[in-house]
Amino acid sequence: MVSLTKKEAQAVIVHSESFPKSPALRGVAMGSLHKKDRIEWALEKAVELGVDYFYIYQADHSERARWKKSRLDQIILSASKQSKRTWFPELILADNLEYIKQDAHQRSQGIDLNLWAAHESASLQTKPPEK
C-alpha cells in the first residue's frame, strides 16, 4: 500500500504471474432443462470438474426455456472463484446440435471429438477430417 484515504487506496504491484490456458479443451453440451435450478446446478458442477466451455441448446422436442445469459455467467463466475480456477469457462447458447458440431470442430483443432445425445435416435458422433 502506498497511500490510503477514506475515498481511495493506492498500491504498487510488486509481482505478477501469468498462467497459460491449458491446450486441451473440455466442453459440455447440455440440452434445455426446464427447471432453472437444474441448469444452474449442472453448470456449477461442470465448472468444478474443469470444463472449459458449455453449449446450452434448445432441442427440437423439449419445452422452450428462457435463460438469462447474465445469470448463467454469474453462476459460472461464482463457481470458478469457489474452485479457484484461473480461467473462466465460456458459455455458448446454441440453437441446435448442428451449430455445436461445427463450433466444436473449430475448437478441437484436430483432436478426436465425440458428441453424444441422451436419446438413441438423436445420437451424433463425429471426428475431425483425416489428415
Residue ranges and their predicted role:
Residues M1-S18, S70:
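N-terminal positively charged helical leader segments and presequences
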Residues K6, S16, N96, E120-S123:
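Residues that form or immediately flank small-molecule/cofactor binding pockets and catalytic motifs
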Residues H15-W116:
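RNA substrate-binding interface of SAM-dependent RNA methyltransferases
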Residues R107-K131:
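Active-site/ligand-binding-proximal alpha/beta "capping" segment
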